Amino acid sequence: MTKPTRISLIHATPLAIAPIAKSFKRLWPQASVFNILEDSLTADLKAANGNIAALITRFSALTRYAVDSGADGVLFTCSAFGPAIDAARAGVCVPVLKPNEAMISQALELGSKIALIATFAPSIAPVTAEFEDLARQASKTIDLRSICVPEAWAALQQGDAGTHDHLIAQASAEAVDCDVICFAQFSMTSASPATQTASGRPVLTTPDSAVAKLKTLLAPHSY
C-alpha cells in the first residue's frame, strides 16, 4: 500500500489551522497533515518593528524540524514572514511553500487589476513584494490595491467570526472595479462567500490555492 503524502503545516497563529484543515479535507483528503504552531512569532515580529531578519534562524529551525519529521512538503501559513521563508527553504530537499505564492500565480492569470485585502497590517508589505516579484517574472504589469481591515482581525481574535466576515465583505466595496480579490491571510478564508456576494468579484483564498499547488507538485496523478 502506498504511503500517504506527508505535509507539514507551520503556523504563527492558531487562527490559520482550521481554514487550511478544511481545504485539505475538501481538496486533498488523502494527504497526511501535521501541524507545527509557534505562536510567539507574530508578537516577536511586532517587537522587532517588522525586522524579518531577526527571525530567519527560527524559520530555518522550524523548516528543518518539519523535514526531519518526515515531511514530503512544507507549507507556511503565516503571510507576514515571506523573506524569512525564502531564506529557510534555500537548499531544502522538499517543496517549501510560502502561503501566498500559489494564490498570487492564480490571480495573475485572472487579470491585472487586483485587490489585496488583509486584516493584519504587517502582512501587506511582504505580500505586495511577492506580487510585484511574480508579476515581474511573468512579464506582467499589475495595478495592486491594498485594503487593510484591522477591526476584522480584532473581532476574530475575540471569537467573533460573523463580525470578522462582515467587515471584510464591507471593505470589498473598494474593490468592485478590480478583476479579482485576494485574501492575504489564511485566517480570512471564512469571509470568502460574503465578500464574493458583496463585491461581485472572484475571491481567491490562500488555503485552497496552496493545497492545489502542493497536490500538483507531490501527487500530480491523483486528480
Provide a role label for each language-model segment.
Residues 1-223:
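Non-catalytic structural scaffold of enzyme domains
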